[in-house]
């Protein structure tokens, strides 16, 4: 164990192959000397023993291949590898004689009872690690051997080499067996059971080269599953192979199975049913009654399928999933059927409404009470009803006309009577209108006043300006008045009065013409701008 502890993952130490080859040579030399010394009878006995041991090893290999195949199907390949690598390498480092002894001890110590299944599952043999070596090439050329992954068929060379080694070991002398197995006796018992439990390869060639991919829990489970018995498939012990004849060996050839298992045939039937169902769901609205018939047929088919499943005894999970699928499909079909029926009813109702078109107003006639009428006789009551019906029809006909007006035009001779408040407002309005007309007439009759023309106003302005420039005394007096007056408005009034007085004096006698002019205004008249 310790001498191979430092081997890295992915590398192979080939030292044990050389030791294998040397041990094989020793065994061959011993067997040659023994064959020369033995009698012909002893040689015949040894040959029969070799044949029996070969057949025993073949049967164990066949059982191991079948059990390994089942375990490869059950267990996924993803498991930690490190602990198993060291164990398998350490167990494979023993010489060939010790390995043969180990196999014999394991098979004698443990009865192998393999339960033959009713049906063989489909096995995909991809990526099986098949390692084979050649001892002669390693001793002559010193080349390194590489692990090669091949399918299960080319591994017959490895089986033949293993059988030759086992034959050589069994034909060797007892001294070589005792000397080779004494050093590894305890390791055979301990490591043999571990290698037997951890072996999940499809054949015994994994003892030579393979690295198992099982955790310790799975090793324990696989060891337990080997002990499950079936009375028709018990095998003889390895130690008793030389004593029994070839006729007592149990035939372990694989049973003939049909091309399609019951589970696969049922799955094919379900797939076909699903295809038919998808096609029919495309036009459900047109095939409602066909869907009803399909539901009946499907229910019959599902019942028959359930009976077939009970006969074939499939797994519980497949039963549950199929029952759930069937119930879901049935519910889905019922839902689709109800939806299509509702849609069809709605479409029919809409079509009937469209056919009827716009309906006219229809007034329900009140039902005549059968009670006795004391105020009118029966003939009078009937006449009143007829008149009422006639009037009702007339009113309905006028209501249907768009431009009809039932309003009676009022006569223009009689105006509407007004209230006293409206009359007072009307009188006030008339008075205001009369006053406005009088003011308008007075404004239109007014003529323009004398001296209000623009030319006359300009002439007056120029005269006033010339007078102010020619008489500085008046300007000085005006300034003194402005200084002593407390208010500015008083100076304005004084200057205005003085100007008016001067103007009046000048206008009294015109020097150019000499004729006296008309006096415009007396001096006590107020000016317009004051």
From Swiss-Prot:
Stretches with biased composition (Polar residues): 50-63, 227-236, 491-501
Superkingdom assignment: Eukaryota
Sites of Phosphoserine modification: 19, 138-139, 215, 245, 327
Biased composition (Basic and acidic residues): 35-49, 67-82
Chain coiled-coil ranges: 372-447
Family: Belongs to the CFAP97 family.
Record PTM Phosphothreonine, positions in chain: 133
PANTHER family to which the protein is assigned, alphabetical: CILIA- AND FLAGELLA-ASSOCIATED PROTEIN 97, CILIA- AND FLAGELLA-ASSOCIATED PROTEIN 97-RELATED
Family annotation (Pfam families): Hmw_CFAP97 (PF13879)
This protein's record includes keyword Calcium: no
Start-end of Low complexity biased regions: 170-203
Protein name: Cilia- and flagella-associated protein 97
Organism: Pongo abelii
Biased composition (Acidic residues): 129-139
Example GO biological process: spermatogenesis
Renumbered residue ranges of the record's region Disordered: 29-83, 116-258, 395-417, 483-530
């Amino acid at each position: 164990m310790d001498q191979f502890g430092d081997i890295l993952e992915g590398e192979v130490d080939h030292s044990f192959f050389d030791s294998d080859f040397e041990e094989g040579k020793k065994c061959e030399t011993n067997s040659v000397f023994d064959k020369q010394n033995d009698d012909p009878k002893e040689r015949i006995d040894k040959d029969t023993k070799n044949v029996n041991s070969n057949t025993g090893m073949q049967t164990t290999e066949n059982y191991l291949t079948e059990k390994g195949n089942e375990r490869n199907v059950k267990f996924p390949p993803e498991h930690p590898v490190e602990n198993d690598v060291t164990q398998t390498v350490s167990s494979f480092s023993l010489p060939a004689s010790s390995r043969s002894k180990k196999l014999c001890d394991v098979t004698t110590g443990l009865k192998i009872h393999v339960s033959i299944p009713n049906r063989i599952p489909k096995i995909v043999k991809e990526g099986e690690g098949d390692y084979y070596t050649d001892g002669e090439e390693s001793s002559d050329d010193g080349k390194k051997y590489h692990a090669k992954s091949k399918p299960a068929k080319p591994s017959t060379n490895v089986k033949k080499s293993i059988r030759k080694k086992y034959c050589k070991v069994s034909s060797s002398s007892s001294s070589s067996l005792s000397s080779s197995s004494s050093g590894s006796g305890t390791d055979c018992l301990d490591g043999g059971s571990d290698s037997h439990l951890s072996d999940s390869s499809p054949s015994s060639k994994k003892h030579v080269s393979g690295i198992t991919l099982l955790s310790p829990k799975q090793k324990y489970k696989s060891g337990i599953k080997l002990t499950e018995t079936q009375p028709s498939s018990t095998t003889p012990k390895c130690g008793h192979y030389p004593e029994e004849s070839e006729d007592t060996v149990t035939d372990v050839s694989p049973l003939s199975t049909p091309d399609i298992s019951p589970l696969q045939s049922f799955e094919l039937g379900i797939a076909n049913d699903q295809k038919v169902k998808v096609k029919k769901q495309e036009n459900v609205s047109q095939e409602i009654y066909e869907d009803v018939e399909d539901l009946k047929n499907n229910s019959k088919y599902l019942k028959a399928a359930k009976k077939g499943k009970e006969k074939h005894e499939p797994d519980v999970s497949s039963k549950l999933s199929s029952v759930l699928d069937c119930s879901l499909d049935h519910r889905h079909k019922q839902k689709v059927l109800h939806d299509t029926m509702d849609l069809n009813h709605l479409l029919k109702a809409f079509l009937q409404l469209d056919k009827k078109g716009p309906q006219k107003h229809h007034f329900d006639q009140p039902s005549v009470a059968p009670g006795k009428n004391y105020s009118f006789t029966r003939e009078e009551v009937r006449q009143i009803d007829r008149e009422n019906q006639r009037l009702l029809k007339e009113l309905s006909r006028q209501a249907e006309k768009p431009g009809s007006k039932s309003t009676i035009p009022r006569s223009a001779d009689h105006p509407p009577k007004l209230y006293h408040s409206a009359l007072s407002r009307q009188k006030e309005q008339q008075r205001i209108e009369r006053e406005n007309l009088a003011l308008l007439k007075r404004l239109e009759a007014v003529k323009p006043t004398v001296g209000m023309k623009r030319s006359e106003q300009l002439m007056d302005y120029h005269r006033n300006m010339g007078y102010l420039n020619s008489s500085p005394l008046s300007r000085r007096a005006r300034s003194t008045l402005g200084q002593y007056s407390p208010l500015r408005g008083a100076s304005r009034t004084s200057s205005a009065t003085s100007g008016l007085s001067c103007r009046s004096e000048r206008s009294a006698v015109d020097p150019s013409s000499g004729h006296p002019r008309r006096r415009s205004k007396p001096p006590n008249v107020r000016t317009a701008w004051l």
